[in-house]
Regions:
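Active-site neighborhood of HAD-like aspartate-dependent phosphohydrolases
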Residues: 2-49
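Charge-dense, low-complexity intrinsically disordered segments
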Residues: 26, 30, 63, 99, ...
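Asp-based, Mg2+/Mn2+-dependent phosphohydrolase catalytic module
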Residues: 2-4, 67-85, 94-171
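Generic enzyme active-site microenvironment
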Residues: 9-11, 53, 126
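Conserved protein kinase catalytic core
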Residues: 17-19, 61, 134, 166
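A short, structure-level motif marking secondary-structure boundaries and short turns
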Residues: 23-26, 61, 93-95, 117-118
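A short alpha-helix capping/helix-coil boundary motif
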Residues: 16-20, 53-56, 88-90, 110-113, ...
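Substrate-recognition element of Asp-dependent hydrolases with the DxDx(T/V) motif
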Residues: 36, 40-73, 84-93, 136
Length: 171
C-alpha cells in the first residue's frame, strides 16, 4: 500500500525553543523561538504531520521528571494552537542506560513512521545537531541543520525554523 502521508520531524531544544546551555525542564525557562508558531502553521497548512522528537537525558540523570517535560510540551502546544501531532522523548542517557529511541538512533522516528503510515521520501527532519541528521538518515528522511552549534559542512544549513520551512515548502 502506498501512502502520501508526510511529516516534519522537529528536534526541540535549539529549534523550537531557545537553547540555554543546560537542560530545559521548567516552563518559565522554556522560551519558544521567534517564528516557530507561524512556521509550524505554514507546514501544517501544506499537509505535513508535525512530530517533535527530543532527547531528554535529564530524566535518566534524575534532574527532572517526564511530567516536567510534558509541562514544557503543553506550553509549546498551547503557543502553537495545538497543531503538533505527536511529541516523543527519549529519557535515556548512555551513562545510565541504553536506548534505541535516543538520537542518533532512529527509534522515535520509526515509531512515528509506523503510527502515521508515513512515506519517508516525503518527510524531513529539522534539528540543530548532527545526531538529529543521523537519526533521519537512518530511516531515509532528508535533514536540515539549524544554527551554528555543529562544526562541519552539512547542507542544507539554515538560521532557524522559518528558513527550514521555506526549504521544505519550496520557497
Amino acid at each position: 500500500m502506498t501512502t502520501n502521508n508526510k511529516a516534519v520531524f522537529l528536534d526541540r531544544d535549539g529549534v523550537l525553543n531557545e537553547e540555554i546551555g543546560t537542560y530545559v525542564w521548567e516552563p518559565d525557562k522554556f522560551i519558544i523561538c521567534a517564528g516557530v508558531p507561524e512556521s509550524l502553521a505554514r507546514l501544517k497548512a501544506a499537509g505535513y504531520y508535525l512530530i517533535v522528537i527530543t532527547n531528554q537525558a535529564g530524566i535518566a540523570k534524575k534532574l527532572y521528571t517526564a511530567a516536567d517535560v510534558q509541562a514544557c510540551h503543553a506550553k509549546l502546544q498551547s503557543a502553537c494552537g495545538g497543531i503538533l501531532d505527536a511529541l516523543y522523548f527519549a529519557d535515556a542517557h548512555p551513562s545510565v542506560s541504553e536506548s534505541i529511541l535516543r538520537k542518533p538512533a532512529s527509534g522515535m522516528l520509526e515509531k512515528a513512521v509506523a503510527r502515521f503510515n508515513l512515506d519517508v521520501s516525503q518527510c524531513w527532519i529539522v534539528g540543530d545537531r548532527l545526531r538529529d541528521m543521523q537519526a533521519g538518515a537512518a530511516v531515509g528522511v532528508r535533514g536540515i541543520l539549524v544554527g551554528e552549534t555543529e562544526v562541519g559542512d552539512f547542507a542544507p544549513r539554515v538560521a532557524d525554523l522559518r528558513a527550514a520551512a521555506d526549504i521544505i515548502l519550496g520557497m
